[in-house]
């Protein structure tokens, strides 16, 4: 199985602009990418970062084993096109033209990803296995069908169900809070701090930036220490 | 295993007040409760609704087998106290004083609950198994320890981890998007319509009320047909 991790290498995570400077957003996005790559390698696979611009894995905070297992492919086309160019086609991977090598696509902002959660996805038996995020996004999927193609525009989880149906592919929805939580908006930062482990880079970055959990009566939010806020 | 489903029988789901009338909120909350009870029975258990006021299961839209398997216990105390009164104590369930019967607590607003997702929770081996929701809530848990007690006030998932640690109970976090999605706010209604099945009552109610998925370019939202809006 190939595991592709799409990554917006320039101006990532603009929806966090209210709480993070551009430099912080870049550092945070790279920390999440490093956590995702680590989880993929721990799950026994060699991830390919599908980056919109050149990226040197040496500049990420990665264990040597993860860095060595990873590679980068640059493709500046929109996400859907770049991913589709990586999906299996009939004849890939086997001389007889029938076997194809499945391709997994795991978004780089799944900061809560763990090897266990990824293994549950990677071991799904269907032609297409999808992990939906909130709002019918597609946070991760595995494609083991030569005709299935992605369409990340709009309600992609619903689209992917339809596309699978249209090409005669079986589809399984994989139930995971960890993989179903993509980190896009300020409210999502709570999840990084609540569920991240001590060795994860993304929560460490947030703490460096001065974020901490604020436990009020009704719920948990993140707060940024006054003196650490961007001026 | 006992399965307890806490249910606010009066004025439920006030955070949906912007989009649903009080009567609609009551009907929707009861539809979600019926879906949760059905999933519990499909998972092989007999649910007890822990209601804040008297509730007649005959008035819920339930299959006969589910209605027959269910029961109601009324407890008008705050959630934490009412649940703690139901948790196992040392000596429960066995003559020798060592065996206890585990108790599961599944919230009534987990509209996406399925038998599969519940079975994954119910089969957890730890003394305490917790399904967190967004914002560090506790959406469901199974307690198989005589000293563990819940505290739903505030960041309950974090509190429950601490409480388990303090009483020497092992804790497992169960990873489920379906059980991790509680339906509290208008934005959550999208998930009911995206992930509900054809036989589920909660999405059927929303459609009766005039809600439908609105698939714009960027994301999916729910929209309510103009003529169906409360005046």
Swiss-Prot record, chains A, B:
The EC class name is transferase
- Write the Enzyme Commission number(s) for this entry: 2.7.7.68
According to UniProt, the reaction catalysed is: (2S)-2-phospholactate + GTP + H(+) = (2S)-lactyl-2-diphospho-5'-guanosine + diphosphate
Question: Is Chloroplast there in the keyword field?
Answer: no
Q: Which GO terms describe its molecular function?
A: GTP binding; phospholactate guanylyltransferase activity
Pathway connected to this protein = Cofactor biosynthesis; coenzyme F420 biosynthesis
Task: Give any single GO term for biological process.
Answer: F420-0 metabolic process
Keywords from the UniProt entry: GTP-binding, Nucleotide-binding, Nucleotidyltransferase, Transferase
Cited function: Guanylyltransferase that catalyzes the activation of (2S)-2-phospholactate (2-PL) as (2S)-lactyl-2-diphospho-5'-guanosine, via the condensation of 2-PL with GTP. It is involved in the biosynthesis of coenzyme F420, a hydride carrier cofactor.
- Complex and partners: Homodimer.
Homology family = Belongs to the CofC family.
Q: Which NCBIfam families match?
A: F420_cofC (TIGR03552)
Protein name stated in the entry: 2-phospho-L-lactate guanylyltransferase
> Which species expresses this protein natively?
Haloterrigena turkmenica (strain ATCC 51198 / DSM 5511 / JCM 9101 / NCIMB 13204 / VKM B-1734 / 4k)
Q: What is the lineage of its organism?
A: Archaea, Methanobacteriati, Methanobacteriota, Stenosarchaea group, Halobacteria
Q: Which gene encodes it?
A: cofC
């Amino acid at each position: 199985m190939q595991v592709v991790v799409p990554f917006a290498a320039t101006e990532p995570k603009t929806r966090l602009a209210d709480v993070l400077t551009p430099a912080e957003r870049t550092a945070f996005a790279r920390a999440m990418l490093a956590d995702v790559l680590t989880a993929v390698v721990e799950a026994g696979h060699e991830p390919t970062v599908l980056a919109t611009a050149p990226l040197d894995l040496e500049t990420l905070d990665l264990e040597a084993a993860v860095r060595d297992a990873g590679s980068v492919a640059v493709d500046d086309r929109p996400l859907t096109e770049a991913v589709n160019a990586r999906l299996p086609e009939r004849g890939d991977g086997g001389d007889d033209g029938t076997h194809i090598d499945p391709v997994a696509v795991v978004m780089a902002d799944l900061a809560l990803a763990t090897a266990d959660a990824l293994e549950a996805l990677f071991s799904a038996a269907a032609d297409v296995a999808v992990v939906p995020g909130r709002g019918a996004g597609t946070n991760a999927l595995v494609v083991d069908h030569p005709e299935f193609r992605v369409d990340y525009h709009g309600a992609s989880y619903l689209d992917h169900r339809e596309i699978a149906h249209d090409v005669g592919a079986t589809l399984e929805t994989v139930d995971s809070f960890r993989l179903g939580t993509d980190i896009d908006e300020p409210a999502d930062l709570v999840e990084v701090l609540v569920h991240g482990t001590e060795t994860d880079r993304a929560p460490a970055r947030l703490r460096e930036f001065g974020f901490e959990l604020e436990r009020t009566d009704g719920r948990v939010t993140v707060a940024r220490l006054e003196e650490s806020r961007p001026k």
